Amino acid sequence: MKYIFLYCLCVLSITLNGQSHEIHGNVVDKEGTPLIGATIVVLEESDSTMLSFGITDDSGRFEIYDLTEGSRILQISYTGYAEHTSLVSIHEQGKISVGEIVLAESTTMLEEVSIKAEHIPMGILGDTINYNAAAFQMRPGSSVEDLLKKLPGIEVARDGSIKAQGEDVKNVLVDGEEFFAGDATIATKNLEAEFIDKVQVFDKKSEEAEFTGVDDANEEKTINLKLKEDYKNGGFGKVDLNGGTESTRNAKINYNRFSPSVQVSAIGNINNINENAFSLADYIDFMGGFQNALDGGGLSMSREFGNGQPEGINNQNALGTNLNLQISPKLKLNAHYLQANSDLNTDRQSTSKTFTEVQDFTAIDTSLSNQKTTNHRLNTKLKYKPNPMNVFSLSAKGFFLDNDEITNSARTVLIENSLQNQSTNIQQTNARSSGINTNLLYKKKFLKKGRNLSLRANLESTNRLEESAIDYGIFGIDIDENSLQRQTFESRLQALSGTFKYTEPISRNLYLTLSANATSQEESPIRQYFDLSSAADKELLDLSSSFIKSLDQYDAGISIKRNSKKLKLKGGLQFADLSLVAQEGEVQLNDKSKYAYFLPSFSIKKKLKGSKDLDFDYRAQVNSPKLSKMVTQVNNLNPNFLILGNPNLNPEYIHRAGLSYTNFDEFNFSSFIWAVDADFSKNKIVNSRAYLPGLVTQILPINADKYISLTSYIHHSSPIRKLKIKYSINSTLNYNQYQNQIDGVSNTVKTAMLMTGLRLENRKKDRFDIAAGIDLDLNAVSNDFNSNFDSPFLNHSLYFDGFLTIGKGWNIGTKYDYKTFNNAFFDEGQVLHLLDATLSKSFLENKLTVKVTAHDLLNQNRGISRTGGINTLTDTRFTTLGRYIMLGASYRIGIAKKRDITIEEGRD
């Protein structure tokens, strides 16, 4: 199979590598000054079809590659200058020089210049790169994600994540407005390329920097999708219906209605093929910011495992709406709502090998489970700006989660193939969580430039109620127990905080900031245990208890920063005073409750020549223990793993430093990023383990004296002109070292993880889009007491993706994966061959698309996970989706009539 993959790579390079011609020259103004960033386009003489393009570099030089013989039109444009057009005859192999081309200043407005907008693929103005969507030929029904794949300097991974200029894109705007903020893929997967006029890439400043005019160096790589004029007023969207073998189904709809003052969008999805309408980050964010409400419970979530397939078979439906409303020139509302229901069935088997100083043992676990979950999340933000000097904003985030789960599991424990014990566990759980987080912010800037004030108040309230019934039995050597229990777990969190920040300009580029913050938080869980084996449903008072964790924290800080065009420096010192109390009833449990810390910080951001940046950041921070780590109530929802809390935990004190170098060459669209992060923690909270009679695992959090974490990241992407392809390399190395305890014995744990990937793809994607790559994952864990445990996991995968337009309206696609999972402790390596295919045809002027989709044609898909803990190796198999074939149709709603496109430079 490796040879087949290598053959595919050869086909890729041979297919793309034909005779190649080049045109080069220089672009200057009448004074002979190089014009940097001028757009160069080569067109077919017969029909003005764009063949290739580029932009001039720092010296005004350009080189256009991948040209074939024939008569070509050379078109050069630059903002504020008249367009240059000339005819070039390409008749031999090699480079053709057009010499120095002088552009004259334009005497007309940009919109009056006689040019064809669809020929200008991109332009650069300031910090913004503008891509003209009309210049890139798209097949019918293409999404924005498909469009982004064609844009030089932008990379789209197989999971839909986006990099622009080598940096991760976390936010995608639509006409400058938030679109389901927090999930960039909702816009790129649900909006069609047909709707887009321009794609703009820029570094978005923080809201504070945009308002005050003082750069705080907190920038985020952002993409803005500018709609065509026809789609800025009216409704448009898409309906997609699919059904197939094995009773599979997948129905999607998205609809958008925009006007100058209102943007309304809705998306919906119903499917049973394990497809998420929202990203995993969205599902996590259903509870994000409210994590304390979940601590201590037994809620589980669907997770991604070793072969990239979700665990189990999931029937789900999801709905999302987004609203941007300009109520008045001074008042603006943004809101989005996400809702998801899932019904997940899982069949799971695992074999784990545990290594201890006394004896090693093997555990074989099986489980059947059904989990029904309903999630709701609502985010709103109301912004009022009465005048340019003041702004008020009120934001509120709310969530509701309902989870019903029933699990039937069994466990067998062996020592050297000798049976030690067997256990069974039937558990039924219902959990409900709800919460709200409100934030009120006032910002004011004064007449003196740079002087500003901000006040913030935050209120958070969450509630959680969980009820479980457990029927558990274990018998074997040293143990014989049965338990029929009902447990209730109720937790409340109340938190209030306030922040003050004042900035005073000391000189032109020097600013002094004073800040203060006060936080008060209380969490009060109650866990009750009842014995169901008695007729009276007797409460087990020796286990039941209430607990209170309270945290009061006061911070005061001072910082000074210096900003210039090329260099930004910031240094600060913060003092934190904490009062952390754990108590049962009126009895305080923790020996120490008062803590004080000095938290220094320093950062430097240096802009080097061209698009090169060098950043360094250091800061100290303190993290207080979570409720689940401190609560004394025993969590025995899984009686084979008893989870205890430690009320005497100290806060973590962390020194964190990071250094990064970024280089993006917008002239040849290559990028390079190198980053290294180092954490040194004192009192890092880690989980110690002890093995009780029956080899039941007891987990107790403790403070590690020292915890070291090092992470290095490298990303490089660049075109290979002669092969007409581009490549990208990603590599992440993580190393951790800390002290832990197993059965009360101190143990040094070292973990290392290396993830490396190489991807090759063709550059010109008009008719075909081909990509191939390899991913390697190496994980290793070592400890002091057992050298035999130091056995790494090596997983690697090869993949090939292809999409081809084979005729008018006809498209065919394929996706192939070759995956291996290896570890010396397991009997044999596992190999998977996964093959998907699609065939589609467009009708009715591309409004209707009919398609056939085949998943796992070789019927080899299996759920596999091989992982390692501090002293445990685990091999897991689980149910996942197998082979099916679907027939479907999609229909585009609200297609507007075509209009001439006007190119705009910059962003609004």
Across the structure, where does each feature detected by a protein language model lie?
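A short, solvent-exposed loop/turn motif at the edges and junctions
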Residues: 43-49, 71-87
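Outer membrane beta-barrel strand-and-loop segments of large Gram-negative receptors
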Residues: 366, 495-497, 539-545, 644, ...
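Signature of Gram-negative outer-membrane beta-barrel scaffolds
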Residues: 511-613, 785-790
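Structural motif
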Residues: 24-35
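Short, acidic Ser/Thr/Gly-rich low-complexity loop/linker segments typical of extracellular
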Residues: 45-61
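Membrane-proximal, glycine/serine-rich, low-complexity loop/turn segments characteristic
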Residues: 19, 32, 61, 82, ...
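Outer-membrane beta-barrel translocator domains and adjoining extracellular loop/strand segments
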Residues: 212-213, 277-283, 346-363, 405-419, ...
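Conserved C-terminal beta-signal and adjacent last beta-strands/turns
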Residues: 757-778, 790-908
